[in-house]
């Protein structure tokens, strides 16, 4: 999970909110909202950090609509999530579909609490937190430790490690190269994209400083 810095809401969303009886379901088209969220998040899922696009993303509500309808059109409550295997059995779902109407403890868009400070990763690709409630969010509510996601994170790190080991055959990476890689993974590329599973890679690179 990567911290999200929220920007201004799309103008058409702000205009629609003034409509009497406005609801998220009736707000259309949603293209400008999706585009705004994708740009904000560097085209990665707000929860699992896999690559997303307008065609395969969902607009997640951190505070679910059924829990607090008053925030259904609040841009600060909107996040871009992957499809999370919607329609599959619950055990195979993750991210937005898996969350359902559960209110999360952790919020990647919280301006007062950086979610990255509460999340840790094991070498095998698992995500966890020392905070019991947050760990429950990650592992159970969002199902971020389902095997395909764990494997994807692990494979991404393996690729980075292999690249560095080619540069440093003795496997003693230079501090400057590590810092360079951290900077690259912390930044959007020329297409405005963050790398998939970027925080997982950054977490382990920082441990090698």
Language-model regions: role of each:
Residues 133-209:
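C-terminal, charged low-complexity interaction regions
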Residues 1-20, 36, 41-44, 62, ...:
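Hydrophobic scaffolds flanking metal-cofactor catalytic centers in soluble metalloenzymes
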Residues 1-31, 200-209:
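A boundary/linker detector
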Residues 22-34, 59-67:
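Short Cys/His-rich Zn2+-coordinating modules
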Residues 91-153:
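Long, low-complexity, intrinsically disordered segments enriched in glycines and aromatic residues
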Residues 32-57, 85:
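Short cysteine-rich loop/turn motifs with clustered Cys
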Residues 34, 49, 66-71, 105-109:
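Catalytic micro-motifs at enzyme active sites that drive phosphoryl/nucleotidyl and oxygen chemistry
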Residues 50-93:
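Histidine-centered nuclease catalytic patch
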């Amino acid at each position: 999970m990567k911290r999200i810095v929220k920007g201004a809401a799309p103008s058409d969303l702000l205009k629609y909110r003034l409509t009497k009886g406005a609801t998220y379901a009736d707000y259309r088209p949603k293209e400008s909202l999706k585009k705004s969220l994708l740009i904000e998040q560097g085209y990665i899922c707000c929860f699992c950090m896999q690559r997303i696009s307008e065609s395969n993303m969902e607009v997640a509500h951190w505070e679910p609509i059924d829990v607090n309808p008053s925030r259904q059109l609040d841009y600060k409550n909107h996040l871009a999530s992957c499809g999370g295997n919607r329609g599959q059995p619950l055990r195979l779902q993750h991210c937005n579909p898996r969350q359902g109407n559960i209110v999360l403890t952790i919020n990647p868009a919280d301006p007062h609490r950086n979610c990255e400070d509460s999340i840790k990763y094991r070498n095998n690709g698992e995500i966890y937190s020392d905070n019991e409630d947050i760990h429950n969010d990650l592992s159970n509510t969002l199902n971020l430790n389902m095997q395909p996601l764990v494997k994807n994170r692990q494979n991404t790190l393996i690729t980075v490690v292999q690249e560095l080991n080619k540069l440093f055959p003795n496997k003693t990476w230079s501090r400057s190269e590590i810092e360079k890689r951290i900077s690259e993974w912390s930044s959007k590329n020329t297409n405005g994209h963050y790398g998939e599973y970027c925080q997982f890679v950054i977490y382990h690179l920082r441990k090698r400083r």
